[in-house]
Design a protein with these regions (language model features):
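Flavin-dependent oxidoreductase catalytic cores
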Residues: 1-313
Length: 313
């Protein structure tokens, strides 16, 4: 069974990918790391700063898979060609993002509203692009019952792997992932299938492997940010030590400071990571509130020192 790191905007960037592999590899390393989505520019002029995220030299270690968020199939195919020129083989199409700002433009899971539009998009992509193309999807817009028609469209194209997040667009990330609906859909899929959604512990990971042994992979998102040693725990039972977690977080902080050219901007990015990580420390509620309000680097650094005096859970 392959384990993948999910693309999460503002979290699973190259700074995180490097720090996670450094501190928790090789046993804690994912087989693949899916990069947060890129939107191909309509003028077909690439922005150097955005493309730096996918520069091969900035992504040593396990394979990285770029993800595209688009609604123009020919434009997406052009971008796939640009990514191939950088040395990437597989490219992933994001048909699952439920964010309102994305779906309002007919992108992400907004593409699932109209099967004809979805079909035309995929036809344009696969007619003009070469090489392996995977897809990340949801079950539908408002009901899992929509997935049968969506899958009929996916079956028309040589999708190398289909990652299914078993929620619908309107759920966002509320409620539970619908594993019953996933179990119903899986036997109907003709392409390799990866599961994604609510995998936060080694026990949940192993339960999925047992329930769905035919999966090609399991993709982990928020659970990986909350516990960067999750895969190591799943493989050999070794959790993150206090020293490892501190080194990992310090590398993130310094990496973001260098990337943004500002420790203040790094603090904002670190608070996104701490949103998931803070619950690893017992009695952290008061410090969590203070951390949310922190603006200055010195405030952040003092609070992190205080957090690391607490017992780890």
């Amino acid at each position: 069974m392959q384990y993948y790191a999910a693309p999460m905007e503002g979290l699973t960037d190259r700074v995180w990918r490097q720090a996670q592999q450094k501190w928790f590899g090789p046993e804690g390393t994912a087989h693949r790391y899916y990069a947060p989505f890129l939107s191909p520019p309509e003028n077909r002029v690439l922005i150097k700063k955005k493309m730096a995220e996918l520069a091969p030299a900035a992504n040593p270690g396990a394979p990285v898979i770029p993800q595209l968020l688009a609604k123009d199939g020919e434009l997406a195919a052009w971008m796939i060609g640009e990514l191939r020129a950088l040395g990437y083989t597989e490219v992933n199409l994001n048909l699952g993002c439920p964010s309102g700002t994305v779906t309002a433009k007919g992108k992400g899971s907004g593409m699932l509203r109209d099967p004809a539009v979805l079909d035309a998009f995929l036809d344009a992509v696969f007619s003009h692009a070469e090489g392996p193309i995977s897809v990340k999807t949801r079950l539908g817009v408002s009901s899992p019952d929509e997935f049968a028609a969506i899958l009929d469209i996916y079956d028309r194209y040589p999708i190398c792997e289909l990652t299914i997040h078993p929620r619908v667009m309107r759920q966002l990330y509320r409620g539970q992932a619908d594993r019953a609906a996933f179990a119903e859909a899986l036997p109907r899929c003709t392409m390799p299938v990866c599961y994604n959604g609510d995998v936060t512990t080694p026990e949940e990971l192993h339960a999925l492997e047992t329930q769905f042994p035919q999966l090609s992979g399991i993709m982990i998102g928020r659970g990986f940010i909350a516990d960067p040693a999750l895969l190591r725990r799943a493989r050999d039972g070794t959790g993150a030590s206090r020293e490892e977690l501190r080194g990992y977080l310090d590398d993130l902080y310094h990496g973001y400071t260098e990337l943004f050219g500002s420790a203040g901007c790094a603090v904002s990015r670190m608070k996104a990571h701490w949103f998931y990580l803070i619950h690893r420390f017992a009695g952290s509620e008061k410090l969590e509130k203070q951390l949310r309000k922190a603006r200055e680097p010195w405030e952040y650094e003092v609070l992190v020192n205080q957090i690391f005096t607490l017992p780890m859970l």
